[in-house]
């Protein structure tokens, strides 16, 4: 029995890495950071008062060596519609970026005026990388859901996606008694 087991073991290792080898491609992942100097959301009160509300963020390559990088946005309305566009095409990272409401109205053809922006809408920002071999790596699917595995989504090493909800902040200042 030992001789037969040894023979099978030796023969099975003879072609190790041959036809059973699964090729792995190198990928890339972004790191996106919201700026501390601007809101982490779109302030609908300021927007309704006619202000050109803006957001700032920083983007860098966390992993990999992409040949081309686009900063892309996915805008999901409170009603469930999803709009996708390239916010900044063929950029060099690392870099700081800024987007105003007027910029968003310009790049998303489905959003015509500032009043189209409502509470519950969310702008999600990430990257689309093109690798040297032509492979395109999308972090988001066309419907705005994640196109990457949970280990990329939940890593503590970098943020591959940042989201800016549309919100109405409230001032609940005062004195409260906790019982």
Model feature map: region roles:
Residues 14-178:
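Acidic/polar, low-complexity intrinsically disordered N-terminal segments immediately downstream
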Residues 1-3:
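Sec-dependent signal peptide recognition
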Residues 9-12:
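C-terminal motif of bacterial Sec signal peptides marking the signal peptidase cleavage site
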